[in-house]
């Protein structure tokens, strides 16, 4: 059995978008990523647009992610072939003057986009867009991006965890749950907005010092109104509403590297005090 045949080889997964890196990670060098068991290289072309292609040079299949960027062109590390906008080969250094670039020298690019401070790839023809977060266009909210991490867990297992609320009293007693409240609250499943499907519920949480900093409330116990929604294939949006009017919106993203390994990142939107610099808050303050 391979490390992709249980999940990643399913053809339907090729037609969805996956977050593979932060936009800030694509600055001066190409970046290699593995998605659904296949290796890709992503870089910025001369227009600063994100381009992605299989991570192998069509000449001798050396990884293009080992190359470098020259004036927006990706130069291979092995023989110096250069690829410009749209993955087209623009230079074969060993060829004599006047010799045209052969058509097979061009890269077969995949769909690439930037949204929410992240780089997204879709290996096949997209059947749907990148998950919508309307708050991203709302000037009352600001966004925080964190690092993209590599986890030894399947994307399905991670998504299951993000949707599960029965572990809150045991794992998240300082943020999402209380040790003394182990019963799962009554929830109703149904379609939410923007293509998400999920549920809403209320949860009591102990308002410790960290929670008081995040919520702006001094009460020892708070009631949070939470809405959690799933978006195909591995995206979860969780909205936390406080009685003060403060909202936290989390977009939790699992990207399958293979059947047992995933990339994980999350994005947070908040409508709190803009006079407090983001650098003065730890990532834990956002949740």
Residue positions per predicted region:
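Short non-domain terminal segments
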Residues: 16, 81, 166-168
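Short coil-to-beta-strand transition motifs
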Residues: 12-15, 245-247
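A generic structural signal for short, non-catalytic loop/turn and secondary-structure boundary residues
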Residues: 12-13, 26, 35, 105, ...
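Rieske [2Fe-2S] iron-sulfur-binding domain
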Residues: 2-12, 19-143
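C-terminal catalytic domain of Rieske-type non-heme iron oxygenases
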Residues: 49, 127-287
């Amino acid at each position: 059995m391979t490390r992709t045949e249980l999940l990643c080889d399913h053809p339907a997964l090729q037609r969805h978008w996956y977050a593979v890196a932060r936009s800030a990670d694509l600055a001066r060098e190409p970046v290699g990523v593995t998605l659904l068991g296949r290796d890709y290289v992503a870089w910025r072309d001369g227009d600063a647009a994100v381009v992605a292609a299989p991570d192998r040079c069509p000449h001798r299949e050396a990884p293009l992610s080992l190359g470098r960027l020259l004036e927006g062109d990706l130069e291979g590390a092995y023989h110096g072939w250069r690829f410009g906008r749209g993955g087209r080969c623009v230079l074969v250094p060993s060829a004599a003057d006047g010799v045209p670039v052969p058509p097979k020298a061009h890269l077969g690019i995949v769909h690439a986009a930037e949204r929410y401070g992240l780089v997204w790839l879709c290996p096949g023809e997209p059947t749907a867009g990148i998950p919508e977060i309307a708050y991203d266009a709302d000037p009352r909210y600001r966004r925080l991006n964190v690092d993209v991490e590599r986890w030894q867990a399947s994307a399905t297992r991670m998504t299951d965890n993000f949707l599960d609320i029965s572990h809150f009293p045991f794992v998240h007693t300082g943020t999402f749950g209380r040790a003394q409240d182990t019963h799962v609250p009554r929830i109703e499943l149904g379609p939410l907005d923007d293509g998400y499907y999920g549920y809403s519920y209320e949860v009591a949480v102990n308002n410790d010092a960290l929670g008081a900093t995040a919520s702006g409330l001094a009460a020892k116990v708070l009631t949070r109104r939470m809405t959690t929604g799933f978006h195909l294939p591995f995206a979860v949006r969780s909205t936390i509403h406080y009685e003060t009017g403060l909202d936290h919106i989390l977009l939790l993203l699992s990207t399958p590297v293979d059947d047992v390994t995933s990339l994980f990142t999350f994005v947070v939107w908040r409508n709190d005090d803009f006079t407090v610099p983001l650098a003065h808050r730890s990532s834990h303050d956002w949740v």
